[in-house]
């Protein structure tokens, strides 16, 4: 199990903590930024295995690139995939619940 977590944990970047996402915790919806290459089934398998929970549904979207300037260099910020994970009513993620 430890090898599985060590391999797939970098794909799960971090949980998003904003005012809107904290309001979603009341409805048992958690928001994570994940690797862009993962699909819904892979996200589901990783989270179910790491946290030992059952997932009801997953919604994802990819944020658009944003232009940024640093001194005279113009470039694009990297885009990422955001996953909204709804759990079954009896499950919670103990480290991220409100």
Swiss-Prot record:
Locations listed in the record: Plastid
Swiss-Prot/TrEMBL GO biological process terms: translation
Record bears the keyword Lyase: no
GO CC annotations, alphabetized: plastid; ribonucleoprotein complex; ribosome
Keyword set, alphabetical order: Plastid, Ribonucleoprotein, Ribosomal protein, RNA-binding, rRNA-binding
Gene of this entry: rpl23
One Pfam family here: Ribosomal_L23
Organism: Euglena longa
Subunit structure as annotated in this protein's UniProt entry: Part of the 50S ribosomal subunit.
UniProt name for this protein: Large ribosomal subunit protein uL23c
Major localisation: plastid
Protein role: Binds to 23S rRNA.
Family: Belongs to the universal ribosomal protein uL23 family.
Molecular function (Gene Ontology), one example: rRNA binding
């Amino acid at each position: 199990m430890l090898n599985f977590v060590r391999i797939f944990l970098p794909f799960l970047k971090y949980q998003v903590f904003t005012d809107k996402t904290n309001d979603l915790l009341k409805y048992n919806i958690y928001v994570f930024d994940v690797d862009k290459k993962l699909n819904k089934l892979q996200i589901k398998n990783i989270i179910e295995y790491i946290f030992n929970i059952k997932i009801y549904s997953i919604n994802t979207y990819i944020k658009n690139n944003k232009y940024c300037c640093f001194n005279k260099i113009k470039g694009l910020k990297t885009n990422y995939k955001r996953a909204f994970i709804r759990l079954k009513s009896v499950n919670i993620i103990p480290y991220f619940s409100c």
